[in-house]
């Protein structure tokens, strides 16, 4: 009995313990909405961290954590600068300057150790920050986070784990081709040579034992070349036997889809590097340049082939917003899952090398029209982006704020060494100087005559300098500017620098110059540079410069064989101001088609228009105030989809007051309205004398900045548009004298290139018109570069529909 009673007490005790514990258990949080909690590793000090990925510097990269014997990544969900601060300190840096998402440094492999990490920034270790917990994640490696640390080490930091995991990748951050032939050293670009990698002791070679075409493919891509070819190793073998080589890398095993040699499996030499390639020699590659960089007739023919992919809105060759052709219509690519592998397919398809950057968020400006592709996933072996896996777009998937862009590796041409700008306030502006070779072979710098120097010339020069928008042997520089982006243009002739005559110097020339110097776009083409402090350059060595705006270098533009400058004084030397960003104006074509109509307007209502000279010449002989004029009216809505505000070239002091309109006009010629015959002959034109520029309305979240009223600032803000309604004065073409027939309505924005833009090819809009003397049919309105060349040729043949009647 006592035993039975004792057992009963035991059972009651166990039930009292077990039942409350069951009811105390809670349901775990749903996967889609985690509740981060602090997750502490067994020993936070035992965690190891490293920076990986490519291309990158030593203080940035994909963050990886070594936990429970395995390296893994961190998901970018809820990632912040505070997280980056904690991680950078654990890596031995004083703090973070930024962080990256969407696997900017490439996708990692293996585990994703942490997700939804939320640090305050003061934690000693990321392991004590809130998160889902170790190994608990709903991410893919497309979402790997990266950090950018301040390049300053913590005093006394001695964690060898961090240093050791960075050593190998740091050694191959720079790669070059060293040409061996004497003639090859003078020819640009260098397409063949010994592969060398840079380390702390200088440049070293790679042993070619086991070297494969896939390795060559990766190296050529880094050098800016889309393809490779076999190389004659016999010559190089003889050369190598006479040289003392230093072999840093013993073995390379690329897959061929990598964008950087650092991403390939590498074996390094740690012994006697001069004798560590028995039976081998330095690796040698031979690359095939794209059509833009070759003299080969076969490759040049490829330039004339209709493209299916193009880059728009970039300041330099090899960068821009990705656009693809589908059903004769150009459209953009959504940036979902956009990465370096897919970007490299685009770059090689365009005739460049592998991708340096896969940019998201409309980094090169927003596109127009349809978005053709979403979630593009390439393997890296495709010849065209259309060969990659992708999803068709739906209205809910993407907007043009998510347009994908690329920056490609391009061949080094040395153009930026042949031009300079001096005297400007920044490196983006200055007087233009060029380096020129005289008849005796000597080199000297000189000025460029500023007569006719305009925005187009300046855009060419800014691209040459690498400063953005605005022949190899002609050296150019900017002199005297307030910054590296401005200055007087100077060229070198023999051993002497000289200036450029500013007669004819315009936006197109400045575009090329800024591009050549790598300074972006041209903001202004300057024709008088007396206010910029001069270098010792006094000679004018170049005049008559005329560019199309597409050249890589100012030497590829037309110019006088001998200097012929009417204004040869130094004050008239050409100059530029370059900028990293530019505006991009485009007309709302559907709105033109929807609002076009004919009005017979009585002359007594057109006195103000006559004062503005908005009627055709025959109006002067009309029987005023009796009779009427027949007007083709329409609305024009001009959007700025670029990356900088569109501002009038003229300062406020030169704006003109228009009493009829009650405000100032800041631009004499802002748009051209033309009615043309099918063969392009102009039969009537708009006579709008001048324009004011303002923000009529803007995209959601964008504030208006410019207004025509009073004497305020004028312009068009990025993300805003200027609307000229069909019912305002002079918003028409006077077609009183036009006979019935088939015509083309054309509207061109910024026709004289007075203001720099990132893309001038989308400034023209065309419509088909059929006029029977009483009614007009307007159809097929589109931006000039919206369709393929083949579709554009069929432009006049499309049938129209009745659009309106005379009002």
From Swiss-Prot:
Disruption phenotype: Craniofacial defects. Cartilage elements embryos do not mature and chondrocyte morphology and extracellular matrix are affected. Keywords: Copper, Cytoplasm, Disulfide bond, Glycoprotein, LTQ, Metal-binding, Nucleus, Oxidoreductase, Repeat, Secreted, Signal, TPQ. It catalyses: L-lysyl-[protein] + O2 + H2O = (S)-2-amino-6-oxohexanoyl-[protein] + H2O2 + NH4(+); N(6)-acetyl-L-lysyl-[protein] + O2 + H2O = acetamide + (S)-2-amino-6-oxohexanoyl-[protein] + H2O2. It is found in: Secreted, Extracellular space; Cytoplasm; Nucleus. Its cofactor is Cu cation; lysine tyrosylquinone residue. One of its GO terms (molecular function) is copper ion binding. Its main location: secreted. This is Lysyl oxidase homolog 3B. It comes from Danio rerio (Zebrafish).
């Amino acid at each position: 009995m006592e035993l039975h009673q004792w057992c009963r007490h035991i059972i009651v005790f166990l039930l009292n313990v077990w039942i409350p514990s069951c009811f105390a258990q809670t349901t775990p949080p749903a996967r889609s909405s985690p509740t981060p909690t602090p997750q502490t590793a067994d020993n936070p000090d035992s965690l190891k961290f490293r920076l990986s990925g490519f291309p990158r510097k030593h203080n940035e990269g994909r963050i990886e954590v070594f936990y429970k014997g395995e390296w893994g990544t961190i998901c970018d969900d809820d990632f912040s600068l505070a997280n980056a601060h904690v991680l950078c300190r654990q890596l031995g840096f004083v703090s973070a300057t930024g962080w990256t998402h969407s696997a900017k440094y490439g996708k990692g492999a293996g585990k994703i150790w942490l997700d939804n990490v939320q640090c305050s920034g003061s934690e000693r270790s990321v392991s004590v920050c809130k998160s889902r917990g170790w190994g608990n994640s709903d991410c893919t490696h497309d979402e790997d986070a990266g950090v950018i640390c301040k390049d300053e080490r913590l005093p006394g930091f001695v964690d060898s784990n961090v240093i050791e995991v960075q050593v190998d990748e740091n050694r191959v951050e720079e790669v070059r081709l060293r040409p061996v032939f004497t003639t090859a050293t003078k020819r640009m670009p260098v397409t063949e040579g010994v592969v060398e990698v840079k380390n702390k002791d200088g440049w070293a070679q790679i042993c070619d034992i086991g070297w494969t075409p896939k390795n060559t493919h990766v190296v050529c891509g880094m050098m800016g070349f889309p393809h490779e070819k076999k190389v004659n190793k016999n010559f190089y073998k003889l050369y190598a036997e006479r040289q003392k080589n230093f072999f840093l890398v013993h073995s390379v095993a690329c897959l061929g889809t990598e964008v950087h040699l650092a991403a390939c499996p590498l074996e390094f030499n740690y012994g006697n590097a001069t004798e560590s390639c028995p039976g081998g020699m330095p690796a040698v590659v031979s690359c095939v340049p794209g059509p833009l960089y070759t003299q080969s007739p076969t490759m040049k023919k490829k330039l004339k082939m209709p493209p299916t992919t193009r880059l728009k809105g970039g300041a330099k060759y090899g960068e821009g917003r990705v656009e693809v052709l589908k059903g004769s219509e150009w459209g953009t690519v959504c940036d979902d899952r956009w990465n370096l592998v897919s970007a490299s397919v685009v770059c090689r398809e365009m005739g460049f090398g592998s991708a340096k950057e896969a940019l998201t968020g409309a980094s090169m400006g927003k596109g127009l029209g349809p978005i053709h592709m979403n979630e593009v996933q390439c393997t890296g072996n495709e010849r065209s982006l259309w060969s990659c896996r992708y999803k068709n777009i739906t209205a809910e998937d993407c907007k043009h704020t998510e347009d994908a862009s690329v920056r490609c590796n391009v061949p080094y041409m040395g153009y930026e060494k042949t031009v300079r700008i001096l005297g400007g306030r920044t490196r983006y502006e200055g007087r233009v100087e060029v380096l020129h070779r005289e008849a005796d072979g000597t080199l000297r710098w000189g000025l460029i005559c500023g007569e006719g120097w305009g925005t187009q010339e300046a855009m060419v020069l800014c691209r040459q300098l690498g400063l953005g928008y605005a022949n190899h042997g002609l050296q150019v520089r900017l002199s005297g500017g307030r910054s590296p982006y401005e200055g007087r243009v100077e060229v070198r002739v023999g051993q002497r620098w000289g200036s450029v005559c500013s007669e004819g110097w315009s936006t197109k020339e400045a575009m090329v110059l800024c591009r050549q110097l790598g300074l972006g776009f041209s903001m202004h083409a300057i024709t008088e540079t007396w206010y910029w402090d001069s270098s010792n350059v006094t000679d004018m060595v170049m005049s008559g410069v005329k560019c199309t705006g597409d050249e890589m270098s100012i030497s590829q533009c037309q110019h006088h064989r001998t200097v012929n400058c009417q204004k040869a004084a130094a004050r008239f030397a050409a100059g530029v101001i370059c900028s990293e960003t530019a505006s991009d104006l485009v007309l709302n074509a559907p709105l033109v088609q929807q609002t076009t109509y004919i009005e017979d307007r009585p002359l007594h209502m057109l006195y103000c228009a006559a004062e503005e000279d908005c009627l055709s010449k025959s109006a002067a002989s009309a029987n005023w105030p009796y009779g009427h004029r027949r007007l083709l009216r329409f609305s024009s809505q001009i959007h700025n989809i670029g990356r900088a505000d569109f501002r009038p070239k003229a300062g406020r002091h030169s704006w003109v007051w228009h009493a009829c309109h009650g405000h100032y006009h800041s631009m004499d010629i802002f748009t051209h309205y033309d009615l043309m015959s099918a063969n392009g002959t102009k039969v009537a034109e708009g006579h709008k004398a001048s324009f004011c520029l303002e923000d009529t309305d803007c995209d959601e979240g964008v504030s208006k900045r410019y207004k025509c009223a009073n004497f305020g600032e004028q312009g068009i803000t990025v993300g805003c548009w200027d609307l000229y309604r069909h019912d305002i004065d002079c918003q028409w073409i006077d077609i009183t004298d036009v006979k019935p027939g088939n015509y083309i309505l054309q509207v061109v924005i910024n026709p004289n290139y007075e203001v720099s833009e990132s893309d001038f090819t989308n400034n023209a809009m065309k419509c088909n018109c059929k006029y029977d003397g009483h009614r007009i049919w307007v159809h097929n309105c589109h931006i000039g570069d919206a369709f393929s060349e083949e579709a554009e040729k069929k432009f006049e043949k499309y049938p129209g529909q009745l659009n309106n009647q005379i009002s």
